[in-house]
Amino acid sequence: MTISKFLSIAAIIFSLTILGAEAKPPAGSSDVSSHVNKGVELAQQHKYDEAIKEFSAAIEANPKSAKAYLNRGTAKRALQKYDEAMADFAKAIEIAPKDEMGYLERGQTFVMQKQYTEALADLGKAAELKPDDTIAIRLRGFAEIGLGDWDKAAADFTAVLQKDPNDAQAYERRGFVYRSQKKYNEAIADYDKSLEIKPDPDVYAKRGYTYVTYLQNYEKGIADYQQTLRINPNDYDTQQRLQYAQSALAAKNAPAGAPTPAPTPEPGLFTPLNIGIALVVLLVLIGVIFVVTRRRGGGEDEAQSSGRIR
């Protein structure tokens, strides 16, 4: 699960929590409660501008309502008005410094802006104020992943799982951490557990990537990619990875090529046949030279004989 996907879920849970908290307002705060509840309803319908107006009305009715500031901050954050959201969260912390929610929401906003170091301070404070709440610990794990602090991230997601052993997202995130630490078998085990609790195409894709890229287990990787595409057929990245894995498996299983025969050497000049022919030619030449030489010697004798006085 990506950080943005988780944060959107966390925002919904937060809004529902605030709605329940404001349902029983203290005496004399009915106007504040009414505006807050109406604002939460509008925010849940993604009507953030209208929700902000309701939360602002609640603040006008009671400038000390930390919840109104928190809710207005979350609505502004949904509109990506991060600086204004931060100001509202800071005001909520000023009003209620012992309430973890202001630190939690500001820390979450820091994570969304990839300001991980700043996020750690707020999320650590939120976890300190409410140790049993896993949201702050989980978000701190996200920040630690962003900083590449793998050991601390693994510890935080382990802490989440100790409180809730059926948290599929915590298994997925810890699996990602293990993979980043090159603990591939541990990563696979966490992905397995996450999928056992809640099948998710993103987790199938991550497990498939781990099988193919790091373990060269193409068969299992292909199966995971195919499962991802059954759930989400338009996942282009997974389509490309599936094709790569199939090509790699085909290359791995291809039969070895037949050995190329060594070339037959060309016969050399000094073969028995060539030597025999050379000897015959040599003998013939010797014979010819001998005959010619004999003939020349006889002619000279005849010339000398014919020149004598008889």
Q: What kind of region is each of these model predictions?
A:
Residues Q44-Q45, A78-L79, M112-Q113, L139, ...:
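Register position in tetratricopeptide repeats
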Residues K53, A57-E60, K91-E94, K125-E128, ...:
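Conserved structural position within tetratricopeptide repeats
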Residues G297-R310:
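Cytoplasmic C-terminal tails of single-pass
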Residues V40, T74, Q108, F142, ...:
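Residue-level recognition of tetratricopeptide repeat
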Residues V32-S33, A66-K67, E100-M101, T134-I135, ...:
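Helix-start (N-cap) detector for alpha-helical repeat units in TPR-like alpha-solenoids
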